Amino acid sequence: MMDVDRSIRLVIVTGMSGAGKTQALKYLEDLGFFCVDNLPPSLMPKLAELFGQTEGKVSRLALGIDIRGGRFFHEILGALRQIAEIGVAYQILFMDASDEVLVRRYKETRRRHPLAAQGRVLDGIQRERRLLQELRGLATFIIDTTHMTPADLRKELNRRFGQDRESPHFHVNVVSFGFKHGAVLDADLVFDVRFLPNPHYVPDLQPLTGEDPAVVEYVMKWNVTQQFYRRLTGLIGFLLPHYVAEGKSLLTIAIGCTGGKHRSVCLANRLAHWIRERGYSVSVEHRDMPRPADRSDEEEQP
């Protein structure tokens, strides 16, 4: 047996069907876990061993196990013993909810319970609860989602498995773009700065970009720009901690001008710097700067 990195964090996610296991795995993935769902228990030790040999490339692994595994499910206790034998510590996250809520969720989704193929949903739930009783007793964490919204579940998982705010699990991506080249489709926030004075109409500035000091000075010297930037940073400063608290992992802020070469580039750089100074992980992307084939006609209008 090869040496295994014992620092790897392994979380086994299981519990009642309909209690939120799939959603939990999705949120754990946002927190930096490598997630595998509906894995036969017999494969768990081998997978844990393989990921323990990645030399730190994967340090957080979450495995989803549920009753859909059918005849494989009884193997889980033996698999847990094997994982312990190879030196990988694990935690069991058991997702639960009241029978009443589980029945309602199944009826709302019109899905069939895996253990109630021909019978009532409640019969399947009660049978599953009996089968999982021993595993529930081994759980490190039990999360009851009876009264939880998806946002509540995200917050709870972030509290138990998240890291510091400054970690890469919350990241801000600031994108400059030109409206004439199309919108940024995955943007969470979009700001249109085409109302600002346009360097395109200053001959000496036209061939430059928003990364050139002369363009930055021109864009930022106007009172309207300064007022807008002050209000922009005020809004972003208000929003960021609320996005973190909600459990959002990636926030994309798009700033657009006509061609994506001058005004949006300048303001995207300044905003990214401002966000970075406040301790957040941030990157900046200038999607449309420059497009060599279009340089002769960039920013044709105000």
From Swiss-Prot:
Keywords: ATP-binding, GTP-binding, Nucleotide-binding
SUPFAM superfamilies: P-loop containing nucleoside triphosphate hydrolases (SSF52540)
UniProt-listed Gene3D superfamilies: P-loop containing nucleotide triphosphate hydrolases
Pfam families: PapZ_C, RapZ-like_N
Signal peptide: none
Purpose of the protein: Displays ATPase and GTPase activities.
Protein name as it appears in the record: Nucleotide-binding protein STH186
Native source organism of the sequence: Symbiobacterium thermophilum (strain DSM 24528 / JCM 14929 / IAM 14863 / T)
Lineage summary: Bacteria, Bacillati, Bacillota, Clostridia, Eubacteriales
